């Protein structure tokens, strides 16, 4: 009996490290990071560096695939139907979940996904060319009361907010759709549109003096543009709270979830990712884990539904 007990104890002691080692073997093949916008915008710029950093941590290639359309709604639709058990994940903002389903029919819902981590706080700006006769948002409104204007949108949410502002102020405003920041920038710089939404691409052009941030759609001022007001400060009761996050289909294996979260936390402290995110695209880097992000997504969705009257 004594020998049997000792043998059992030995088996148990050996099993624990083997289990830990097994968890560290995931992933066993390359992964795919989905970006819901065209190449060249802030999400794409951040995502490609993030993919390299996660690849370093996970020991497998992380390939970036752009799936633009509908302010990332196309990418989320495809992700919801993905059965790759964690090998395919999305990096990007959350307005396609917290807003888009409120105003249009989509083939996914919040509970179709898990929100593993947030790595950056979204920067939602209204921008214009430095060559325009207006620089502040108040000046844009004053100009628009006397002249027809054009606005370049990127997401259904920024478009909805600007349409409401235009109605309040009596503006004659035409909307020009873009596939992301890379499509927005030449329109603004070439003065083909009067002003536009930017989720971060403006950070490439404001230091050179080519582009100006007129106001922020975020709830708080950007630490990178402390003198630029928010729409709420200007008297409009609209704001966007968003986080650049890692999102996966609901129900992926535990080992995949744990390793992806660990890779995200590793990236949040990585100098290369912090440099591209904060110094190049002007997004404050954070790390918020799954519990906090699951709560944030549902809280923002509920608040947005209340504002939209749903």
Question: What are the functions of these language-model segments?
Answer:
Residues 186-227, 234-235:
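Pocket-lining segment of extracytoplasmic ligand-binding domains
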Residues 1-8:
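Bacterial N-terminal signal peptides that target proteins for export
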Residues 78-87, 101-183, 243-276:
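Hinge/capping helix and adjacent helix->loop/strand transition within the periplasmic-binding protein
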Residues 119-125, 215-250:
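Periplasmic-binding protein-like
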């Amino acid at each position: 009996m004594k020998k049997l007990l000792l043998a059992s104890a030995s088996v148990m002691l050996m099993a624990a490290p083997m289990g830990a080692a097994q968890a560290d073997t995931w992933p066993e093949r390359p992964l795919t990071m989905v970006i819901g916008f065209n190449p060249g915008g802030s999400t794409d710029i951040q995502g490609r560096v993030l993919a390299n950093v996660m690849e370093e941590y996970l020991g497998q290639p992380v390939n970036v695939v752009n799936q633009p359309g509908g302010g990332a709604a196309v990418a989320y639709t495809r992700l919801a139907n993905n059965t790759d058990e964690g090998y395919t994940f999305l990096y990007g903002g959350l307005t396609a979940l917290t807003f888009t389903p409120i105003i249009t029919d989509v083939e996914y819902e919040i509970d179709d996904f898990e929100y593993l981590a947030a790595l950056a706080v979204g920067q939602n700006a209204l921008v214009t060319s430095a060559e325009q006769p207006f620089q502040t948002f108040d000046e844009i409104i004053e100009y628009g009361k006397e002249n027809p204007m054009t606005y370049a949108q990127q997401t259904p949410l920024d478009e909805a907010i600007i349409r409401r502002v235009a109605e309040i102020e009596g503006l004659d405003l035409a909307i020009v759709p873009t596939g992301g920041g890379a499509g927005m920038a030449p329109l603004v710089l070439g003065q083909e549109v009067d002003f536009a939404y930017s989720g971060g691409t403006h950070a490439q052009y404001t230091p050179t003096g080519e582009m100006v941030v007129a106001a922020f759609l975020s709830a708080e001022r950007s630490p990178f543009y402390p003198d630029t007001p928010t729409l709420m400060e200007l008297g409009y009761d609209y704001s966007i709270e968003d986080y650049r996050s890692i999102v996966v289909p609901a129900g992926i294996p535990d080992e995949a979830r744990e390793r992806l979260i660990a890779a995200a936390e590793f990236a949040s402290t990585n100098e290369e990712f912090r440099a591209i995110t904060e110094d190049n695209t002007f997004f404050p880097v954070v790390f918020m884990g799954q519990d906090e992000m699951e709560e944030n997504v549902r809280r923002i969705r509920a608040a947005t539904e209340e504002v939209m009257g749903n």
